[in-house]
Amino acid sequence: MRLYNSRILNPHQSIFILVLQCLITIVTSHQEVLFDLSKVGSDLKWDQVSLRHDRDDVWMEETWRNPAATDEKHANQRAYVTCNYDMINPSNWLFSHFIEVKTARRIYIELLFNTRDCDAYLNPKSCKETFSVYLKQFKTSRPGSTKIEKERFSEDIDNWKNIGRLARSNSNMTTETLGMEIDSDTKTIRIAFEEQGICLSLLNVKIYYRICDEFTDQLVYFRPQVTGPKETDMVRMNGSCIPNASKKIPGVDLIGLCMSTGSGIKTSGECVCDSGYSQIADSNGARCESCPTNTYKPKGQSLCKSCPSNSISSEAASSCRCLNGYFRAEDELISMPCTQPPSRPIKLVANAITATSTRLSWNEPSSLGGRPEIWYEVKCSGRGECGTVVMTPGDKKLSTRSVQINGLRPSSDYTFLVFAKNKVSAQFPEFSEKNAVIDIRTRSEEEDVPPVSHLRVDASQSDGITIAWSVSDSDVSDFEVEVRPAIVKKRTFETRHVNMTYTTFIGLNPETVYQFRVRIRDDLRWSQPISYQLGRGLMSSPSSNEVEESQFLNQTGSALLIIIALILIVIAVALCMIVVQKKSKNRKQMSDLDVLDTYKQDSMTPDYHTTSRHHHHQGNLPATLHEQLRSTTKLNAPLIPSFGSPISQPPPYYGGVHPNSGKYKTYVDPTTYEDPYQALIEFTFDISPNDVFITQVIGGGEFGDVCLGGLSKNSPAAAKWSVSNTTMGRGGGGGGYESEPYETVAIKTLKSGSSAKAKAEFLTEATIMGQFSHPNVIRLIGVVTSAEPVMIVAEYMANGSLDQFLRNTDQRGEKVHWEKITEMLYGIASGMKYLTDMGYVHRVSFLRDLAARNVLLDMELRCKIADFGLSRGVRSEGSSVEPEYTTNGGKIPVRWTAPEAITHRKFTPSSDVWSFGVVIWEVCSFGERPYWDWTNQKVISEVMIGYRLPPPMDCPMGLYRIAQWCWKMERHERPTFTQLLATFHKYILQPTLIEHDPGELPRRVQSQSALNTYGSVNVGVVPTPPSSAAPMPSLDDFLRQIGLNHVYGQLVSNNIHSVSDLANTSHLDLLAYGLMSAECSTVRDGLNGRISGSPPGSSGTIHATTRGTRTTRPPREEGFFV
């Protein structure tokens, strides 16, 4: 193919052209007519020549009436007729006038004619049924001679090109179109017709060429274009953007193609309306119309938009300008509304004015200027010496509405200005007037009284004290408390920040005299210190913090006698406690009390309002001092504490135990802290971001990614972890080789930009994990909070989750001995016993989702309980685990949850025992899903009527019997984790007992129901339910159980008064009584579960033959009822 006057296309691209013609929008063609015989009204008098005879009347000009004419004026049309079959070998020619070709490069000759068949004549001398058409091109518009002469034509006949030989195609008139390429320098043409003994009526001759009409596509305008000289030519069309439009992509040509058929298409390029103009559809395709006043449009394909608030525009505007006094920030888009700077702060006051300091506070401005952000700046101006003034937390970009000012001079006047700012404040010309001003005068040194006074010991115990103090300003609630050994050679101390007027120190050394002092945070004035020693009370303060070592030795000598006396007292108390514990051994524990509601527990939680943060000097302290000063619990705690509070446990009970006591610490609910960050400091170890790194992402969670990483062995966190691992056994499975400088750890990250709530929940999980230290509970190493992203660093478990490990092992055909499985279950039970002894709260907000997926395995196949997250999103449909069953109190994993926890929201250690039974079934089935593909509602209804999971294939009956023990409906009949540990320990010592069923199993119940083809249940005699199942309910109770109590009246009105009557009613009868089809199916499923003992909706064992139907035997689904 040839692209005329532009570029040459490969001939093999014809298929591509056809595809373009089919897919791209095609514009209609246009014909430019050069000659039309039907439109000629006068005589033609065309030249004619008979080469082989001396005749000049072979072609006769006649008139005929065209019935298809569009108007009466052209109904009678000129035509040429010839019929010379009686001539011998004729060659008769007819020549048209000269026809100007204009800009045509290819012309089309459309002929309308009719002929007669030769067999219509008896004895023709020379008869033909075809005629020929010729064309000759001329380089001039007016040739010298127009008359055709016979002699000259005979010599010139070779210059006439034969363009077609035509014959009739039907019995009526035939239309044929011939195409001919025109040379670029041709001005005129003549058409000739040769007949050689044919009866022919030449009714019409139409000569034209094709033009691709002008068109607009995607705001690109293309002018009319003549088609190319060849039938396969495509002529390039250069487009241009319509007015008020420009190219969408600069540099891309606007190109179209004019096909030989006269159809134009756009192939590349696109235009968009300019800024301030919007695209409007019209009859030509589209146009760009200017945006009206108070609207705007940037460049692109969007429509005109109304101006944002506080802005206006003129016609054809690309953006809106802000009204006077309104602005946009430099980083804001033109679509954002215009805003103002905030007004001045209000109610600026100075509090706690002393000789050298004061605290300024103010309220938010009355107008924020329509913007969400605001910050404050404070300036010392005018009066007073401002060079020594120090502002905390600073004087620029303050997000709080208060500032502590220190460094003032006594008895001096100062002026302070407070400005409110936002992102547009810098553009406001009169900003200096938008401020609040206050004048103050500091006190003299004589009248300046320290704000903290009357420091005293409020309560004391054998190893701790509570100190309290008074303040002159009741609004102050942020204090800094310092404690230090009063008699040491080195100046070592520790500080903590509290928000109450008391705090507690526990684990104090009876041999040490401690000195305490308090001040308001950010205030340089300390209270008068007090010194205190356990067993001796308040001591007179030494004249100096540094005394001779001999003085220290004299005091320690006298303290030895006190220590010996204390040891004797402790031994006596311990003996008394043992006697008391034996007497109360069978008493019910606090955590099992049913009457202690959640709201009552919350109201009896002891005070946790203080926080302990190590001072930056803490590196110089003795190693035991941090352990001694950990408690924040007030000594005079409530007499009836909530479960898990420190005082509910045997002493010592100041938030923990002595490091060497060997007893479990009690679990502390992080949500009882007023500031969750305080709990994070107390129970976790902060890791430097430089000591931890991420190597790869191995999973994802709600808050962020779960990654594999490393922890530097030289870091304090690694050293602390190594000590704990030495104490309780090596933890995770990827601890790193000895030659490597890092430990392999698991890292859970928080997504950048997470909300404050998400971050608090994320770190609360770390606070929970940080309280646990057990070989079968996942171990927290520390947290990273000083850099993004925030991380939780825990030990790495190389074998992943327990359920996935079992499934993979089973798929690979590897065998795990039942002895090893028993050891795994022993480890899970051990970890659960530890959590129960810790007092880990059994409430839905802290629900322990005990399932095989939340148990991890290390390299030694040691099981560790994990996943202590507070907030779990509902899993997607694509997950392997069905979404949790949601109630008003939270989300419950129904398949693992005890019945009383689902129905009554009662979570106790017995609830965890039920879940542990399901875990046993998961492990014995090698990761199979509990209750298979049943819905949550079906699981609930089946469990409530006594259904229990059947034993997995090849499962030892000893293990399955333990699971059944855990699934007792009455929670008080279930075993404790202590009992479970004893049983598993026995199995480990005597593996042969695993295969032995130590007790009588519940009776296996087979379905006795039969369904006919119409869905009714045929029950001859209602079978006796299992001994432990509920009795047959009344009709009303049964309908309530399946959620159809609203149809009770319909059934009773149709003489159905019992469940037996309902069981003998067919599906069609139920429909006739007014029940919907879905309700009938629910009744049938409920009857299957009630009568047969098989799960509702499952197939019965036998379908009886009724009403002439055939007997079928679907697969049997069996279960156990208890």
Curated annotation (Swiss-Prot):
GO terms for biological process: axon guidance; axonogenesis; cell surface receptor protein tyrosine kinase signaling pathway; embryo development ending in birth or egg hatching; embryonic body morphogenesis; morphogenesis of embryonic epithelium; oocyte maturation; regulation of axon guidance. InterPro entries: EPH_SAM, Eph_TM, Ephrin_rcpt_lig-bd_dom, Ephrin_rcpt_TKs, FN3_dom, FN3_sf, Galactose-bd-like_sf, Growth_fac_rcpt_cys_sf. Residues 1092-1112 have a biased composition (Low complexity). It holds the Pfam family EphA2_TM. Disulfide bonds: none annotated. Residues 31-217 form the Eph LBD domain. The active site is at D849. Its EC number is 2.7.10.1. GO terms for cellular component: axon; plasma membrane; receptor complex. It is a single-pass type I membrane protein. Residues 692-988 form the Protein kinase domain. Belongs to the protein kinase superfamily. Tyr protein kinase family. Ephrin receptor subfamily. This is Ephrin receptor 1. The gene is vab-1.
